[in-house]
Amino acid sequence: MGPRVRVGVIVGVHGVRGAVRIKSFTEDPADIGFYSPVENEAGSIKYRLKVTGEVKGLVIATLDGIGDRDAAEALKGTELWVARERLPRLAEDEFLYSDLIGLVAEGVDGKRLGIVKAVADYGAGDVLDIKLEPKGDMMVPFTQASVPEVDIAGGRLVVVPPVYAPDENEEKSGGA
């Protein structure tokens, strides 16, 4: 089995006939239906899914063989995966979150800062969560200005660290 990509996770049930609520990780949430059948994380079970609607940012779908609420409830937390080759080809400046996680984050001076541990979208755009070395974390907007270079093959990206304004509640150094 080649590389796979997580495209969603079942987060709950919808109604009494076995429909599920899915948090989709596809660009357009309803597009998860185009990748049917999807697999569980182990790759041991395939699910044919049919998108029937969307509610509050979640996809409502039916799965073949799941016909009641109890069966759907048992799937809560199941991650849905597809083979990477089934995804559309990306533009040169597009990346999957899974491609970014684990990359070495370097400063513009080439100094190693840490490792990308997560990518999140809080509504205002993608944000890289970088585990700094030797300790700490840094959140960086995933924009051309903040991340001017991404080298997937080389396993690295270049980060312009954000400049933080001092917290007005912080103690002033050098004071009495």
UniProtKB/Swiss-Prot annotation:
Domain PRC barrel: from-to ranges: 92-165
SUPFAM superfamilies noted in UniProt: PRC-barrel domain, Translation proteins
One cellular component term from this protein's GO annotations in UniProt: ribosome
GO molecular function terms noted in the UniProt entry: ribosome binding
Key words, A-Z: Chaperone, Cytoplasm, Ribosome biogenesis, rRNA processing
GO BP term, example: ribosomal small subunit biogenesis
Cell compartment(s), UniProt: Cytoplasm
Top-level taxon: Bacteria
HAMAP family per UniProt: Ribosome_mat_RimM (MF_00014)
Domain free text: The PRC barrel domain binds ribosomal protein uS19.
Family of this protein: Belongs to the RimM family.
Function: An accessory protein needed during the final step in the assembly of 30S ribosomal subunit, possibly for assembly of the head region. Essential for efficient processing of 16S rRNA. May be needed both before and after RbfA during the maturation of 16S rRNA. It has affinity for free ribosomal 30S subunits but not for 70S ribosomes.
Subunit organization: Binds ribosomal protein uS19.
Protein name per the record: Ribosome maturation factor RimM
High-level lineage: Bacteria, Pseudomonadati, Pseudomonadota, Alphaproteobacteria, Rhodospirillales
